[in-house]
Each structure stands twice: as C-alpha cells, then as structure tokens.
A protein has these predicted regions:
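Periplasmic OmpA-like peptidoglycan-binding domain that tethers envelope proteins to the cell wall
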Residues: 2-24, 31-111, 116-118
Length: 118
C-alpha cells in the first residue's frame, strides 16, 4: 500500500487539525473492497487494509501527531460503505477512515454509559 500523492495535501490538513487537540486517541482504520487478492505484496485483504492504515499513521506521525495517540487497524472487506457490485462502489470501499475517539470520564466530559456515583 502506498499513499497516493493526491491524498497528501488532505492528510496534511488533517494532521494540523489533529495537532490542535493533544489528548484524544485516534484510530486509523483501513478498508478494502471484496475482490480477493491474487499475487502481489499482500496475501489477503486483511494485510492490505492494515497496511493502508499503517501508512496513514506513519504520515500523521511525520506531520507531528503523537504516536502514542494513534492506532492502526484493518477491516478488510468487512465494513463496506457502498455496494461491491460496481466498480464505483468498490472504489469507495477502498479507503482509510480516521476516527477521533471520545475520552470517557475525563475532566469536563461525561462519564461512560452505565457509570454511577458511589
């Protein structure tokens, strides 16, 4: 997996936004279409989706986002956002999502659901 040049300016902007907040954890999730891999550098869509997430994490770290806030994971074809029946749908399913996680119980934020006072 390689970071395409047209995605770099957007990732640079995202890194700048993520650097405004230095607390919340960030999950980077790679995804693929459902076309099985035949040959190439990755034995399956699991490895490809994880590599996609990892390359974005490396880019964010290189642009100042703290590594201890970042996690990378791959979903393979398990979380499509469009139909895999068309080329356009498969293209939309090949993506990386960046999710800022909520801190539960942090000062000024609500406690996790189900938490109660003693």
């Amino acid at each position: 997996a390689a970071l395409e040049s047209q995605g770099q300016p957007l990732l640079t902007e995202i890194a700048a936004l993520l650097n405004v907040d230095h607390v919340h954890p960030i999950a980077v999730e790679g995804n693929t279409d459902n076309v099985p891999i035949t040959g190439g550098a990755f034995p399956s869509n699991w490895e490809l989706s994880t590599a996609r997430a990892s390359i974005v994490v490396q880019y964010l770290i290189a642009h100042g986002v703290s590594a201890n806030r970042l996690t990378a994971s791959g979903n393979a074809e398990q979380r499509p956002i469009d139909s895999n029946a068309t080329a356009a749908g498969r293209a939309r399913n090949r993506r990386v999502e960046i999710v800022m996680r909520r801190l539960h119980g942090a000062e000024g934020e609500p406690e996790a659901e189900g938490a109660s006072e003693p």
